[in-house]
Amino acid sequence: MAVNVYSTSVTSDNLSRHDMLAWINESLQLNLTKIEQLCSGAAYCQFMDMLFPGSIALKKVKFQAKLEHEYIQNFKILQAGFKRMGVDKIIPVDKLVKGKFQDNFEFVQWFKKFFDANYDGKEYDPVAARQGQETAVAPSLVAPALSKPKKPLGSGSAAPQRPIATQRTTAAPKAGPGMVRKNPGMGNGDDEAAELMQQVKVLKLTVEDLEKERDFYFGKLRNIELICQENEGENDPVLQRIVDILYATDEGFVIPDEGGPQEEQEEY
């Protein structure tokens, strides 16, 4: 039976969006680029198969799911696995399948803690387990201008990969000499220009996702601030401690004036 985890998703040891995607991709040998892609439920099903072999009917999981009713079917399989292993967590299927960042990010933060509490370190070949299937991306989760080619995962005979339970890595695209390969036969540089444009598109998507993550956490902090303000006159030491943390700044940090820095930003 599974070890249940009841901690909330708002803790200091949470992984960032990039670290979470890196953990998922390395553990399952996938190429997810957005947290929203977890809305299909397929990755969770395979993680359950990794943790508790036989708890999930993995052959019934639709890794190529692109429609909402297919996502729901995958989550039904996940729910059955939860029930079989005694997992108490209620899956908010109706929210997850909509593909919104906040709902999916909160759930995967909980799932990471659940995974860490139950993973025993055994080897697992994710590609062989899903018979070489790759996850599809719904059209609504892809930017119209993006046409990034799928990265090869290597041969099917690759050695089983051991998932990373706690290691933090970064999944941000790396810009370096190795990313641009100039074709000696192309004198006009069209291939190089196209690849550079592709890198720009990927970086723009990364910035958009980081802004979503920033707004997500800012919203939570704002809600906490409002609660503190509503109870400001109660002289609660715990409440005061929370307020102190909310308004604390790093040593040497100076809040910029509204007048001067604007010109500098425009010049930059």
UniProtKB/Swiss-Prot annotation:
Q: Where is this region: Interaction with MTUS2/TIP150?
A: 124-268
All copies of domain EB1 C-terminal, residue ranges:
185-255
The protein's matches in PROSITE patterns, at most eight in alphabetical order, are given as: CH (PS50021), EB1_C (PS51230)
Q: Protein name, please?
A: Microtubule-associated protein RP/EB family member 1
Q: What does this protein do?
A: Plus-end tracking protein (+TIP) that binds to the plus-end of microtubules and regulates the dynamics of the microtubule cytoskeleton. Recruits other +TIP proteins to microtubules by binding to a conserved Ser-X-Leu-Pro (SXLP) motif in their polypeptide chains. Promotes cytoplasmic microtubule nucleation and elongation. Involved in mitotic spindle positioning by stabilizing microtubules and promoting dynamic connection between astral microtubules and the cortex during mitotic chromosome segregation.
Keyword annotations: Acetylation, Cell cycle, Cell division, Cytoplasm, Cytoskeleton, Golgi apparatus, Microtubule, Mitosis, Phosphoprotein
Q: Which organism is it from?
A: Rattus norvegicus
Gene Ontology CC terms, in alphabetical order: cell projection; cell projection membrane; centrosome; ciliary basal body; cortical microtubule cytoskeleton; cytoplasmic microtubule; focal adhesion; Golgi apparatus
